[in-house]
UniProtKB/Swiss-Prot annotation:
Any one GO molecular function term: transcription cis-regulatory region binding
CDD domains found in the cross-reference section: MraZ_C, MraZ_N
Taxonomy of the source species: Bacteria, Pseudomonadati, Pseudomonadota, Alphaproteobacteria, Caulobacterales
Protein name according to UniProt: Transcriptional regulator MraZ
Family recorded in the similarity comment: Belongs to the MraZ family.
Alphabetical UniProt keywords: Cytoplasm, DNA-binding, Repeat, Transcription, Transcription regulation
InterPro entries: MraZ (IPR003444), MraZ_C (IPR035644), MraZ_dom (IPR020603), MraZ_N (IPR035642), MraZ_sf (IPR038619), SpoVT-AbrB_dom (IPR007159), SpoVT-AbrB_sf (IPR037914)
Species name: Caulobacter vibrioides (strain NA1000 / CB15N)
Gene, per the UniProt record: mraZ
């Protein structure tokens, strides 16, 4: 499981040290990660074989030729890079993926359970603030629904 947020440096060869905890989470026959442009945000998404298998299963449930399936195949499978760890625990991000999201020197590696994201530090700071606001609003709405359900159940 990928947890926490780490600030890392991207070197001149576009290498980044993947946190040890993240490397341990993807250990297996393939010593590396799958990385692709996120379809949810302006960042890279990455994970191990389990994440790849999950996306593949979602895609394969859709009929061949379905526009959504094609969009997912193009965005995820077509944009995916299979990156192996070097002896220092680094991966080398492809130029086109770095250029897509302005990844230059300082990046945030953000754990999200079964996956993680790689952001430019500045973009992540803005995104994190937006996500905190959405989380507060969502939690308040959920609590209101729970109170309403409890009240409705008690009134019967």
């Amino acid at each position: 499981m990928f947890l926490s947020t780490f600030e890392k440096q991207l070197d001149s060869k576009r290498r980044i040290v993947v946190p040890q905890e993240f490397r341990a989470a993807v250990s297996g026959p393939f010593d590396g990660i799958f990385c692709f442009p996120s379809i949810e945000a302006d960042c890279l998404e990455a994970g191990g074989k389990a994440l790849f298998d999950r996306y593949q299963a979602v895609i394969e449930e859709m009929p061949f030729g379905d526009p959504t399936r094609t969009a997912l195949e193009t965005s995820i499978l077509g944009g995916m890079a299979k990156l192996t760890f070097d002896t220092a625990g680094r991966i080398t991000l492809p130029d086109h993926l770095c250029d897509m999201f302005g990844l230059t020197d300082s990046v945030a590696v953000v754990g999200m359970g079964e996956r993680f994201q790689i952001w430019s530090r500045e973009a992540f700071q803005a995104h994190r603030a937006q996500q905190r606001d959405l989380a507060r609003e969502g939690l308040a709405a959920l609590r209101a629904q729970q109170r309403a359900a409890k009240f409705a159940g008690g009134a019967a």
